[in-house]
């Protein structure tokens, strides 16, 4: 989902740095007390020559795991305006329990959701079908085919990896490992979230 999307987007930049704050990367925000020092360290570690003419994307994943990183977002914006930062997390709502908020006026929010049926139709059949579905009632001649598509979509669900695999293979049986991985991820997130509630 979000990580795949960010990696695709990173191809638009000269440099890409990815941090995961569920791992040892969180220590970085405890070791250094300002974004300048963090940035210098990241450039050295990633063999990046600091050049304001080169575009850089910094991806901070699971930012809710390190409240200091959330607070520092403001300073990335103010002190390093040439560094583009994407912060993401699967449980950002946990920040409100810690009485932390993202810097006002310096953060844009984007919510990722699973594919809708309309997006699925657009991906599978193109904009013409999506426009037909959006703007008119489905002609009788396409009704059964559209109903079959809806039934397939209901079986696949809207998670991007599952939709992509199905569109590439047209084989629902190949989705089983993807569903198992998603289920495992949901279970792990539920356990982490439950620990935060306690």
Language-model features and meaning:
Residues 2:
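Conserved lysine of the Walker
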Residues 5, 9:
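Hydrophobic positions on the alpha1 helix immediately C-terminal to the Walker A/P-loop
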Residues 19-56:
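Short glycine-rich substrate-engagement loop in P-loop NTPases that contacts/grips substrate
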Residues 79-100:
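Sensor-1/coupling segment of RecA-like P-loop NTPase cores
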């Amino acid at each position: 989902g979000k990580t795949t999307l960010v990696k695709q987007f990173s191809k638009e930049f000269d440099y890409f740095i990815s941090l995961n704050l569920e791992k040892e990367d969180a220590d970085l925000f405890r070791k250094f007390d300002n974004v300048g020092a963090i940035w210098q360290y990241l450039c050295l570690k990633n063999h990046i020559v600091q050049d304001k003419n080169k575009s850089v994307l910094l991806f901070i994943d699971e930012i809710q795991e390190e409240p200091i990183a959330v607070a520092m977002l403001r300073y990335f914006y103010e002190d390093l305006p040439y560094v583009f930062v994407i912060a993401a997390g699967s449980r950002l709502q946990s920040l409100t329990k810690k009485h932390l908020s993202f810097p006002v006026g310096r953060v844009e929010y984007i919510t990722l959701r699973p594919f809708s049926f309309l997006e699925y139709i657009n991906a599978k059949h193109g904009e013409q079908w999506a426009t037909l579905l959006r703007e008119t009632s489905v002609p009788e001649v396409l009704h059964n085919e559209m109903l079959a598509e809806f039934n397939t979509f209901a079986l696949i669900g809207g998670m991007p990896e599952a939709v992509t695999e199905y569109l590439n293979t047209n084989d629902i049986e190949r989705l089983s490992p993807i569903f198992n991985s998603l289920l495992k991820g949901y279970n792990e997130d539920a356990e982490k979230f439950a620990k935060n509630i306690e």
